[in-house]
Amino acid sequence: MKTIIVFLSLLVLATKFGDANEGVNQEQMKEVIQNEFREDFLNEMAAMSLLQQLEAIESTLLEKEADRNSRQKRCNGNNVPCGPDHPPCCSGLSCEKTFGYGWWYKSPYCVRPSKG
């Protein structure tokens, strides 16, 4: 009988203090959850700012790549007709009337400049 009374008294004390600790635990859990949400929010904000920075870097790289991939204007090679209706001659060539093709087609041709 004495042991039953001791166990009942321990049960009552444990229940009383257990409820008090449970309330404290609930408050601590609320604080932990709020802190986790704050950390998640801050992490999300940091990720968003990092994403914006990466998008800015990517857009500048794409602009540079687009500039690099742009083709130069086409030019005419050696012995190709040139003039106002045709593309310009490539570097190292000049648009001149020649005796060979010019008299037949009545247009100047891209030729290497004479050294004389």
From Swiss-Prot:
Q: Which residues are annotated as pro-peptide in the record?
A: 21-74
Name its cellular compartments: Secreted
MF terms from GO for this chain are: sodium channel inhibitor activity; toxin activity
Q: Which Pfam family is one of those matched by this entry?
A: Toxin_22
**Signal peptide as annotated in the record:** 1-20
Explain the purpose of this protein: Ion channel inhibitor.
Domain statement: The presence of a 'disulfide through disulfide knot' structurally defines this protein as a knottin.
Q: What is this protein called?
A: U16-barytoxin-Tl1d
Q: Which organism is it from?
A: Trittame loki
